[in-house]
Amino acid sequence: MFRPFGRGLLLCAALALAARCGAGATPIVPTNPTITTDTFTGQLTPNGAFTHQFAVHATGKVTATLTSVQPDATKTIGFSLGTVIGTTCQAVLANDAAVQTNVLTGTAQIGGSFCLRVYDVGSVTTDTGPFTYTVTVEHP
């Protein structure tokens, strides 16, 4: 006769303790890394190339946007994103026919030294003159 009552009392005590366990605990909310914007500019001559380095401080999305190609925004150039290995920019993503507003997007799995390379793909000639470019890179 007392067993069902005892079990019920034990069950109520266990439920009360379980409900109390979460009280006062602050849930862990992941923080998003601060996004850094780097702007790189340069002037491409025939067969020319430039490498720009930047530091990524956390995992996350890396986006490079070819924001300007002058004097003719329709002319193609090449640009790539990669990692720095020693003194070399090892391309991971590349567009060999990029025009103004083209975007490269990747994900940094770890922080470290990354690079952007901008290069002539045959569009810059002595007749066209040098091309001035601007690339914006957003990264954690």
Map each language-model feature to its residues.
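Sec-dependent bacterial lipoprotein signal peptides
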Residues: M1-R20
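C-terminal edge strands of extracellular/lumenal beta-sandwich accessory domains
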Residues: G22-I35, H52, I77-T87, S113-P140
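Extracellular and analogous surface-interaction loops
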Residues: T51-K61, T105-G112, E138-P140
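Non-catalytic, beta-strand-enriched accessory regions in extracellular/secretory proteins
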Residues: T36-D72, G78-G82
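Beta-sandwich interaction modules
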Residues: N95-Q109
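Extracellular beta-sheet repeat scaffolds used for adhesion and glycan interaction
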Residues: I85-D96
